[in-house]
Amino acid sequence: MSKFLSQAAINTLRNTRLGSRQLVRSFAGISNTRNHREAGHQEWGCGQSAGRGLLELRMPVACRRSMFIQTQDTPNPESLKFLPGVDVLGKGNTYDFPNGTTAHSSPLAKLLFRVEGVKGVFFGADFITISKQEGAEWSLIKPEVFAVIMDFFASGLPVLNDAQPNADTEILEDDDETVMMIKELLDTRIRPTVQEDGGDIVFMGYEAGVVKLKMQGSCSSCPSSIVTLKNGVQNMLQFYIPEVESVEQVFDEADRMIDSEFERFEKNLKTLKQQEPSGGGPH
């Protein structure tokens, strides 16, 4: 009975968000019927069995009952959203780990980056978005991610150690009226929709009519992110705030350099493995 009530509660929450999601997507000209998304994949744990993906796990019964993990597709085929059924960072909070070197502040992120094929990790209020390396298979990554998530939340360890979630839309004393309106609109109308897709938009600044934003999570490498940014976010900001002339996407150069180094390291590692002599006894 409790399982059905939990699912009903989840459906109710989704329905309450529908209005704002339709509003943002109407500005972007995006249909609500997305062919690329299969909503509501429901899975339990880390190794599928018959039926609805019920998974056997070597954990106490109480832990198994409390950890109900769902997966949800995102607009980015390289990213998948995991919903563990418990708070990850809490309402409105997000944190991005674009690569393994940024995971030092989170025990959970460190463990997830140990899963082969994981390229990026993103924490939301009640979800975790995993971005995979090109060519990696979800069928191999998902069971490992399920196991890490379930074991971690059963341990009771904090998700973040000494880091603070994004506070980019917090109103500051020196913010002028336009900046305050931009932050308010991002926080109340735009970010909830983007977070539903497993990502986030971070406010980086406003100058001379230009709003600078950084895409995170599934949105950072999504093929449609530019369309969403220009046609959806920009149109909405301009509709409510006449001072806004355009929206620009900001890229973190440090993250780009780290990603480049990781790619080079992985290529070198593959080359070394290919050069290793095949196993065999002495000749």
Swiss-Prot record:
Q: Which Pfam families match?
A: Nfu_N, NifU
Organism superkingdom: Eukaryota
Task: Show the GO MF annotations.
Answer: iron ion binding; iron-sulfur cluster binding
Q: Where in the cell is it found?
A: Mitochondrion
Residue positions binding [4Fe-4S] cluster: C219, C222
Q: Name one GO biological process term.
A: iron-sulfur cluster assembly
Define the transit peptide region by residue numbers.
1-65
Keyword field? Iron, Iron-sulfur, Metal-binding, Mitochondrion, Transit peptide
The UniProt entry, under InterPro entries, shows: FSCA_dom_sf, Nfu/NifU_N, Nfu/NifU_N_sf, NIF_FeS_clus_asmbl_NifU_C, RNA-helicase_DEAD-box_CS
Q: Which Gene3D superfamilies match?
A: Fe-S cluster assembly (FSCA) (3.30.300.130), Scaffold protein Nfu/NifU, N-terminal domain (3.30.1370.70)
Q: What is its main location?
A: mitochondrion
Asked whether the keyword Ubl conjugation is assigned, the reply is no
One CC-aspect GO term: mitochondrion
Q: Where is this region: NifU?
A: 182-250
Q: Which family does it belong to?
A: Belongs to the NifU family.
- State the function annotated in the UniProt record: Molecular scaffold for [Fe-S] cluster assembly of mitochondrial iron-sulfur proteins.
Tell me what this protein is called: NFU1 iron-sulfur cluster scaffold homolog, mitochondrial
